[in-house]
């Protein structure tokens, strides 16, 4: 529940500071899990703020995230990762601290 709450808060924050000219890309695990995120808070938040949310499936790990950062072509805004990947990603400077 805490993980979902943080993801929801992050999504709300990102959506609130962007304009309607931008879309937010949320990366999650796919299937019923992602569908529940979309229906539960993704679609309602996007509709309320008038900002499109693009959903992308991924299989986990940090390799795709590292590749985007190293190439200077970051296309993912919010990523649903395991706690262990969060710790490693923060330690390696892959993720930015989000103080809320």
Can you name each region flagged by the protein language model?
Residues 1-8:
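Bacterial N-terminal signal peptides that target proteins for export
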Residues 8-9, 71:
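Short secondary-structure boundary micro-motifs
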Residues 9-16:
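Bacterial N-terminal signal peptides
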Residues 14, 71-74, 95:
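A general structural signal for well-ordered secondary-structure junctions
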Residues 18-23:
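Sec/Tat signal peptide C-region and signal peptidase I cleavage site
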Residues 24-88:
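Early extracytoplasmic/lumenal segment of secretory-pathway proteins
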Residues 82-100:
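Hinge/lid segment of periplasmic solute-binding proteins
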